[in-house]
Amino acid sequence: MATPSSIPAEPKRDVINRIHRVTRENRSLWYQMTVLQQPERARACGSGSKANSDRRPVDPPPVVELRIIEGPSVEEGKDITFDYNANFFLYASLEHARPLARGRVNTPAAGNPPILTGVPASGMAYLDRPTEAGYFIFPDLSVRHEGLYILTFSLFETTKEERDYDLEPADGDLPPGVDYRMEIKTEPFSVYSAKKFPGLMESTQLSKTVADQGCRVRIRRDVRMRKRESKPGAGNSNSGGNGFERREEDFSRRRTITPASEDPHSIRNRSHSNSSEHRTPYTDASRRPSMVDSYPPPPPPPPPSYEPAPSASRHLDFGDSSAAQYPTPRQYAHQPGLQITPGPPNGSYAPTAQSPYSKTDVPYGYVNRNIPPSCPSPAPSLKHELYDRRQSTSTYVPPSPSVYSTEGHHRRDSRPSYPPTPVAAPHPRPMHSQTSLPALKIDQLVSPVSPLPPIEPQTGPAPELPPINVGGKRKHESVFAQSTRPLHNGQRQVDPHYGRSHRGYSPDHDQGWYSRADGQISSVQFNRYYDE
């Protein structure tokens, strides 16, 4: 009993065609073709210069099944598809699904058939699944223009054995052994423009089965469809009842479309936390300054001066514990009537001009008790010990423990070669508090030990560098004198080394003169030859 053809359940989508022929040895052969997978949609690839590289294959790829049955009928015959010794190939052509009405003016473009690009021919592949048969697969078929089309598949056979030839050749144009057998057409499918193309769906189970057996088929694991809001009652006029709506319903359960923005559950709600509203600024006044803030690179600030002492027993108001840890904002107050006469200099630096500015901040409160400078003030001069670490790090030469004046010690720009430049002072700010700080007890800071002798930095003249020998050629003008006058009638430049005499000749016939590269004149002695 013959094995029946594997025909899917829905005959509308699976077109079947059969033919019967008799060979030279009176073998009765039946050819049955079935379109297992119909094309449904495609995107037009255009007809420009990039149309050949911009492929938009028909989705899903058409799959055609072929069976060869030997016997008096299909039902009683035997399936010899795998045993039949012949080659088959299927050729695809594109046709319009509806006849086009010719206009009044027949243009050449109107009569031309639609253009089908890609690979229109396919050889038969012998597969075991879904059933044992021969399959023709077209994974690379593209259409250039939009519209409603159908595909026509033509079957050609190349017979290898003479006993399988036809009794009479059917077509004389074909070479011997090549015969046209039959054709089959697909259902109409739509080709959309790039703007109207709805997208691609997930690959069918048949495409995945064929691809698993080694056939070249593109497989998509997800749905690439555009979500569009269609008008109620408006259907697809180009579908032509080809089962496109049925396939969309079959795959709608497996679609994984990204939810729209209108879905309230798809968007994360805004956090109700108000922690960012109560956040303090980054620049906190109580923050301890870092090393970068402690030693900024800009030029030195305006020179500070001392506040007028409220009493004779009060001296400079620095070194207080409340202002020794963190710097305070600088405040400059103009004191027109204050003049402080500096004491005699005890160190190697001379006092500079007085500054009318008053500085109330203390440079980071770093005090070194190694140097006892003098402190000039209206009160009796007392020795005290104070050192600014910032002064030591801002100079190039390490400071010596010699005696400095207080004014020259705290002024960072008090150098003999750089006089202070008047800087535009900011607007005077009112003092927050008129209360004065307690006077610093100098007696506890003064060391009874006599001041150390001044240590001067050992500076000397920079060593002279040896002259650099720059090699090079002497210029031609420094050795040879050239005349700028024009030369006529075979005249040549006159060599000043020879004067007016002939170049290279001397009164002695056995001696010659020549000019060397360094400009000197040298002589050469010729050999004497006597005529015999």
UniProtKB/Swiss-Prot annotation:
Disruption phenotype: Impairs production of beauvericin and attenuates virulence during infection of tomato plants. Impairs also growth on the non-preferred nitrogen sources nitrate and nitrite. A motif (Nuclear localization signal) lies at residues 40-45. It is found in: Nucleus; Cytoplasm. It holds the Pfam family Velvet. Its main location: nucleus. InterPro entries: Velvet (IPR021740), Velvet_dom (IPR037525), Velvet_dom_sf (IPR038491). Residues 349-358, 480-492 have a biased composition (Polar residues). GO terms for biological process: sporulation resulting in formation of a cellular spore. Residues 431-462 are annotated as: PEST. Residues 41-61, 206-434, 448-517 are annotated as: Disordered. Residues 244-253, 275-287, 382-391 have a biased composition (Basic and acidic residues). Keywords: Cytoplasm, Nucleus, Sporulation, Transcription, Transcription regulation. Residues 217-229 have a biased composition (Basic residues). One of its GO terms (cellular component) is nucleus. Residues 26-220 form the Velvet domain. Residues 295-307, 417-428 have a biased composition (Pro residues). Component of the velvet transcription factor complex that controls sexual/asexual developmental ratio in response to light, promoting sexual development in the darkness while stimulating asexual sporulation under illumination. The velvet complex hat acts as a global regulator for secondary metabolite gene expression. Controls the biosynthetic gene cluster for beauvericin, a depsipeptide mycotoxin that functions as a virulence determinant. Also regulates chromatin structure and transcription of siderophore biosynthetic genes and is required for infection of tomato plants. Component of the heterotrimeric velvet complex composed of laeA, veA and velB; VeA acting as a bridging protein between laeA and velB. The C-terminal PEST domain is a region rich in proline, glutamic acid, serine and threonine residues that is required for the light-dependent regulation of development and secondary metabolism. PANTHER family: DEVELOPMENTAL AND SECONDARY METABOLISM REGULATOR VEA, SPORE DEVELOPMENT REGULATOR VOSA. Belongs to the velvet family. VeA subfamily. This is Developmental and secondary metabolism regulator veA. The gene is veA.
